[in-house]
């Protein structure tokens, strides 16, 4: 199937695509419901120099990743856009609430050929709640802000500096993102 990006941006020759057709609302709501009983741990860090500011996450097994239809659709979309095969080497779900401190970071080395997939899985999101993912160039200018609409998927080169902003004070729902870290399949 052909998936069409709603937004397509290049930041310093690295791609970023945003899709509204890779994850269904029903799928996102199902994942969200499962999170209510998940064992989140506050052990995730953005960068080594920010390790005193940990945030909540729950890791997924390779088997759990493979059972998610959105994972397979994301892999297919990347294959269609890049003509290359990728696979997940890590999957997890981030949890952020008002007052959490989240830091800018990259997900891979500048010369690595890796992608990150972010799936926004809150069943509803109000624009006033904040929670956008911001993407930066090497001058620390924000080039693109991805609104965390329910079931939205952002796929981007892992070397793009980015940050997920925590929700604003009026938001009482956690900002959940399902993340897949992808590496190129070697033959």
Regions inferred by a protein language model and the residue ranges of each:
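Catalytic core of non-heme Fe(II) oxygenases with the double-stranded beta-helix
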Residues: 76-187
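Non-heme Fe(II)/2-oxoglutarate
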Residues: 1-84
């Amino acid at each position: 199937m052909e998936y069409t990006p709603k937004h397509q941006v290049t930041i310093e020759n690295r791609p970023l695509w945003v899709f509204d057709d890779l994850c269904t609302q029903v799928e996102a709501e199902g994942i969200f419901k499962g999170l209510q009983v998940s064992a989140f741990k506050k052990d995730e860090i953005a960068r080594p120099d920010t390790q005193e500011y940990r945030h909540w996450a729950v890791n997924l097994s390779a088997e759990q990743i493979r059972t998610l239809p959105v994972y397979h659709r994301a892999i297919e979309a990347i294959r269609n856009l890049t003509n290359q095969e990728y696979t997940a080497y890590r999957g997890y779900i981030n949890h952020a609430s008002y007052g959490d401190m989240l830091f800018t970071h990259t997900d891979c080395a500048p010369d690595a050929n890796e992608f990150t997939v972010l799936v926004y899985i809150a069943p509803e999101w109000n624009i006033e709640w904040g929670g956008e993912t911001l993407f930066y160039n090497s001058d620390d200018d924000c080039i693109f802000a991805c609104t965390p609409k329910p079931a939205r998927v952002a796929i981007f080169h892992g070397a793009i500096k980015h940050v997920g902003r925590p929700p604003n004070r009026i938001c009482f729902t956690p900002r959940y993102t399902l993340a897949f870290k992808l590496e190129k399949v070697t033959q």
